[in-house]
Amino acid sequence: MKILGKWLLASLLICSMPAKAALDIVITEGVDAARPIAVVPFVWQGTGPMPSQISDVVMSDLARSGTFSPSDELSLPQRNISTLAQFDAKAWMAQPAEAVVMGSIKPYGADKYLVSFQLIDLVKAQLQSGAGPQAANDLVIDSRETVISAAQFRQYGHRISDVVYEKLTGIRGAFLTRIAYVVVKHGEKSPYQLMISDYDGYNEQMLLRSPEPLMSPSWSPDGQQLAYVSFENRKAEVFVQNIYTQARKKVTSFNGINGAPVFSPDGKKLALTLSKDGQPDIYVVDIATSALKRVTNHYSIDTEPSWFPDGKSLLLTSERGGRPQLYRVFLDSGKISRLTFEGEWNLGGSIAPDGRSIVFVNRTNGKFNIARMDLETRFMQVLTSTRLDESPSLAPNGTMVIYGTTYQGKQVLAAVSMDGRFKARLPVGQGEVKSPSWSPFL
């Protein structure tokens, strides 16, 4: 969204980033608060060069999570180990880490590789360092092996990261997820590109290219489709597109605003903003039948819907109180209630996967920051300290928020943990990237 005075358009025009920015992530805050972990480079048991180093993917994932801080490789007391039998607990006594990830990679046929890894409880190892070999197996938190192709190395690295994250935190990892966004390359004949990539920027794929704006991609709950706004026909229209078959369907094409589409939890409907009957209001449309239900009917602006997990109510931004604030409306009864009161504006809300909290843009004293609010206690916490933050998108495990901000006069993509301790920024490259949307678990 463009913040100063144009908050309705803001719901459709979200943040900027370089297409590969996640590869160059700059952690700006929170390293000291992260939990130390050791990732030993996986041992190559073949001849010739290894296809790629899976442990590099694991280290990067854990660092980007904001929860863990991987040790520098040169500080590790053992570096050429891959099994518990090679693990020397006494050598690790002074290592400031709570767990060790180690593994091996060896050829297993034509373009096949056997990848093994173990997650070792270093705290327990340090406590039991004098207990002898009989206690060694107690140190293994998880141990797995699988056969993969060279093309699957990055994907399996993310899988290992998911296992490590969940075993140590009890929260499902979100490293095997993707991000959708719109790339804008000014000066080109068709500057607008609808893109998807892995959450870290790799495996980028173009879904659509257009000379006219593309906006507001939103993932279906099964991760197979995107809803988005296109101006390719010189007017705002909402489409749904399958990311695998490329098949797409025009869902709405009314006069005026067709914007901010978001899938229902069952994937059968879209909540969106339409102005076909006058002022912008919230509607729900059945994707298969095109049946339309009006949810709000007010002379003020209602926009930016977001579904609660049970599918029975929506979060929305409304000016009905005089300024943009967040409201909740129940679909059956039409009952609507205001949720936010602190600050001058609160808008662009998203709901945490557990339905217990929301993240949104809060304006206080002219500064736009990302904030979160507990829906039971109504306690609000401002998560960021910059001035022009916008468009938060939650990871499917609810631990991180991606948002847009301004850095050195340019829009960039940034991330913040849900407790506000960890912050990262993605430096600007060529072109702009707008409307980031984090996928569900895939």
UniProtKB/Swiss-Prot annotation:
It comes from the Bacteria. GO terms for biological process: cell division; protein import. GO terms for cellular component: periplasmic space. It holds the Pfam family TolB_N. Its main location: periplasm. It is found in: Periplasm. The keyword Transferase does not apply. Residues 1-21 form the signal peptide. Coiled coil: none annotated. Keywords: Cell cycle, Cell division, Periplasm, Signal. The keyword 4Fe-4S does not apply. Part of the Tol-Pal system, which plays a role in outer membrane invagination during cell division and is important for maintaining outer membrane integrity. The Tol-Pal system is composed of five core proteins: the inner membrane proteins TolA, TolQ and TolR, the periplasmic protein TolB and the outer membrane protein Pal. They form a network linking the inner and outer membranes and the peptidoglycan layer. Belongs to the TolB family. This is Tol-Pal system protein TolB.
